């Protein structure tokens, strides 16, 4: 019996356009307009079973794909593929009842990061910085519910695909016209996308370098919106927690090796409760203003390079670094924007570039761009009108900004150009600060004096700056600071340093502010009388107010022999002063000490006195006459207290020991809450762990035990400072044990604390040096 004829499969590939009428025939001769591939898909003979049929189909697929690759219609072959699951953050609750954007995820591999403020990277970002092209084989957007299905109600979540990664004015119905998935709160969901949904303009490939054309680099984006106010099912109030955890599970393919290592350092972070305003006039660019002290501005300034050349008349130069800004708060609808770009801000995300120039009124300005391509081309949004007169004086709206660094003008290694960037001040560094003065609090309309604290202040209203509730200075003067420029000793720009862990600002026993820098000036009025002024640069952690008697300095004498002597006005004013959260203040404490001038940092809880003369020293000049608003003050300060001892007496004749006393335990923010858990001593914590150390313990074992205990305490949720103190007490070093022993013996023998501690430290250093020499010698002998 004759077999049936074989089935023929024909694939036609168009790899060129038809010849132009104006082109000579010779130029197009020999070029095929299409390629035909004929494949015999069935073997002759017996009828195929299921297995043979599958093999035949696979054979056809392989042959067709091979021929298509030969013709160059599928783009280059992937050099490497990487499967990864990226955790991008959470979907928040809806607080307005209207459509709110919760996330906008750009799929370029170097931009796929979580909003933690870290520049750390994974395998996808590392490969993106090494190859010039990328594409996606598939993409699954996983939404993992963070609440039960019965815990909240009233909200639906919509995940949609934006194929152009460009902001648009879309309603809930418009989002439904896209490829999308609706998700019910309390249930897990997966939004699946195929290669046909994710293909790029270059035979399915996208470019990796975000400095290139936006339409070739960004790829599609995933947007997540919510509709309907989220309410708690168990309480008659709104639910403000997270609804879903967002993850991307995908396989990225890369080709075309071209290393751009700096692309892995793109930053993504979030700034909560930041004040944002928009302004502009007809024919002028739309400008966004943000406080210079905000985390957003500090991050942008640190990562932006501003040109020093002058722009043309009427223009302002901008940085080359572009930032995507996503407003995830309900206040997006409350932001007042000049026309016609109200839709852009209400849509929830846009692009900005930093404008060159100094800080004005404590804010930095940004040009706003409606698309990434416009930002690269430096074409800002142009307003057709200004704000209505009734809205120009509207106060800034506090909102939440999630910002992403889109590009990096320099793609090489950045370590060799550190002098052009900003370093981070470390503990013990000396730095220089230029403070821009904010609105002063003054006793009269002429602003000729500045408020300072007066004597007889109620105890509960005293503001203390110190290491604890026993060793502190009393705040006398206070000046509001609108912005700060940080520099090192060579006037190179610095990042904002971390707060000084050993210092805190207290009202009563509760911590109210962090101290970032400090300085102390000592001047002799006579051989036996000295004036000590301390200045502290602080940032308020929570709002608080102080109500007490205030006065101000005046010059009692005007003759040439006593022009530096100042006194406090005996008249006082019972006034309330408010200290605002996140604002910067320069706090001043001035004390008079009788006796020999002490060394080290001096702590005296002494207030200003009416009957004493004060000199205008380095830390008090701004308190004598009020500096104008936006004027600048210059100080050289420290980010860590000097490690020295000093002993002196306050006005109550009580001994006060300076910082770094051996028996002095510092307490951190966790121990200064309203509950104040200082009753539990570190020795109690050590006993709770049942740790006993003999003097013959091996140093290596002690070090291992110390590391193990420290890790255990931190993993249990204890603060690093407290865990370190407990670990040091449980497993002290040989030098620490000797220093403690010698110090206690000398105190018992009648030696003073200062001399005893100095002698104990010297003995500990000698033992440490001898131990190092012995260890080195034994290693050399063994070798």
UniProtKB/Swiss-Prot annotation:
InterPro entries linked: Astro_capsid_N, Astro_capsid_p, Viral_coat
Family designation: Belongs to the astroviridae capsid polyprotein family.
GO CC annotation terms, alphabetical: host extracellular space; T=3 icosahedral viral capsid
Region spans: Inner core: 70-262
Keyword annotations: Capsid protein, Clathrin-mediated endocytosis of virus by host, T=3 icosahedral capsid protein, Viral penetration into host cytoplasm, Virion, Virus endocytosis by host, Virus entry into host cell
Region spans: Core attachment: 393-422
Region (Basic): 1-69
Region listing for Acidic, in residue ranges: 646-783
Region (P2 globular domain): 423-645
Region named Disordered: 1-58
Pfam families: Astro_capsid_N, Astro_capsid_p
Any single GO BP term: clathrin-dependent endocytosis of virus by host cell
Disulfide bonds: none
The protein, known as: Capsid polyprotein VP90
Organism the protein comes from: Human astrovirus-5
Composition bias, Polar residues: 1-16
Keyword 4Fe-4S: no
């Amino acid at each position: 019996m004759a077999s049936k004829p074989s089935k023929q499969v024909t694939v036609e590939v168009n790899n060129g356009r038809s010849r132009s009428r104006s082109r000579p025939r010779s130029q197009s001769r020999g070029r095929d307009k299409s390629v035909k591939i004929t494949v015999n898909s069935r073997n002759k003979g017996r009828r195929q079973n299921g297995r043979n049929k599958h093999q035949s189909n696979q054979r056809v697929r392989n042959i067709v794909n091979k021929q298509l690759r030969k013709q160059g219609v599928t783009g280059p072959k992937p050099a490497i593929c990487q499967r990864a699951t990226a955790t991008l953050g959470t979907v928040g609750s809806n607080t307005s009842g209207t459509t709110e954007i919760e996330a906008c995820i750009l799929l370029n591999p170097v931009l796929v990061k979580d909003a933690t403020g870290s520049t750390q990277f994974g395998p996808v970002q590392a490969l993106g910085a090494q190859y010039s092209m990328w594409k996606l084989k598939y993409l699954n957007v996983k939404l993992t519910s963070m609440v039960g299905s019965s815990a909240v109600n009233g909200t639906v979540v919509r995940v949609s695909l934006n194929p152009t990664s460009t902001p648009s004015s879309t309603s809930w119905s418009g989002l439904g016209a896209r490829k999308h998935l609706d998700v019910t709160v309390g249930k897990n969901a997966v939004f699946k996308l195929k290669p046909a949904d994710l293909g790029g303009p270059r035979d399915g490939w996208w470019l990796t370098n975000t400095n290139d054309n936006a339409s070739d680099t960004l790829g599609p984006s995933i947007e997540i919106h919510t509709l309907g106010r989220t309410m708690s099912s168990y309480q008659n109030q709104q639910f403000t927690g997270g609804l879903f955890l967002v993850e991307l599970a995908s396989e990225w393919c890369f080709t075309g090796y071209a290393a751009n290592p700096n692309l892995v350092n793109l930053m993504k972070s979030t700034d909560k409760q930041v004040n944002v305003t928009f302004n502009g006039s007809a024919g002028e660019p739309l400008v966004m203003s943000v406080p210079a002290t905000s985390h957003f501005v500090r991050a942008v300034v640190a990562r932006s390079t501003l040109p020093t050349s002058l722009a043309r008349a009427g223009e302002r130069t901008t940085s080359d670094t572009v930032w995507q800004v996503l407003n995830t708060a309900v206040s997006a609808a409350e932001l007042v924007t000049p026309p016609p770009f109200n839709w852009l801000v209400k849509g929830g995300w846009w692009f900005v570039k930093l404008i060159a120039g100094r800080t004005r009124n404590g804010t930095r300005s940004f040009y706003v761009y409606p698309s990434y391509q416009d930002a690269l081309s430096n074409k800002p949004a142009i307003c057709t009108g200004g704000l209505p007169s009734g809205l120009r004086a509207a106060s800034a709206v506090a909102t939440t900004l999630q910002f992403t660094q889109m590009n990096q003008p320099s793609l090489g290694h950045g370590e060799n150009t550190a002098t052009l960037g900003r370093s981070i001040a470390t503990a013990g560094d000396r730095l220089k600060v230029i403070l821009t003065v904010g609105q002063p609090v003054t006793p009269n309309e002429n602003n000729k004096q500045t408020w300072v604290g007066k004597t007889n202040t109620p105890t509960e209203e005293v503001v203390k700056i110190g290491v604890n509730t026993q060793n502190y200075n009393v705040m006398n003067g206070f000046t509001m600071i609108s912005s700060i420029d940080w520099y090192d000793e060579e006037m190179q720009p610095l990042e904002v340093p971390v707060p000084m862990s050993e210092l805190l600002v207290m009202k009563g026993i509760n911590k109210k502010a962090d101290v970032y820098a400090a300085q102390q000036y000592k001047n002799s009025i006579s051989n036996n009388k000295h004036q000590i002024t301390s200045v502290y640069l602080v940032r308020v952690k929570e709002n608080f107010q102080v109500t007490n008697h205030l006065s101000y300095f005046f010059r009692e004498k005007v003759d040439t022999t006593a022009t530096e002597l100042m006194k406090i006005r005996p008249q006082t004013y019972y006034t309330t002063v408010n200290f605002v959260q996140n604002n910067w203040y320069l706090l001043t404490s001035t004390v008079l000490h009788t006796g020999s001038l002490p060394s080290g940092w001096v702590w005296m809880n002494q207030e200003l006195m009416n009957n004493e003369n004060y000199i205008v020293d380095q830390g008090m000049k701004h308190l004598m006459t009020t500096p104008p608003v936006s004027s600048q003050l210059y100080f050289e300060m420290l980010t860590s207290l000097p490690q020295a001892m000093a002993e002196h007496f306050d006005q109550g004749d009580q001994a006060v020991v300076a910082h770094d006393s051996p028996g002095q335990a510092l307490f951190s923010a966790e121990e200064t809450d309203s509950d104040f858990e200082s009753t539990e001593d570190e020795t109690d914590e050590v006993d709770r762990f049942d740790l006993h150390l003999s003097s013959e313990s091996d140093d290596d074992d002690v070090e291992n035990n110390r590391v193990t205990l420290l890790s255990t305490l931190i993993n249990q949720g204890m603060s690093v400072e407290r865990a370190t103190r407990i670990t040091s007490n449980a497993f002290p070093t040989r030098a620490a044990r000797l220093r403690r022993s010698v110090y206690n013996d000398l105190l018992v023998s009648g030696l003073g604390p200062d001399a005893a501690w100095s002698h104990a430290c010297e003995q500990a250093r000698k033992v440490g040096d001898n131990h190092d020499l012995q260890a080195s010698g034994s290693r050399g002998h063994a070798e």
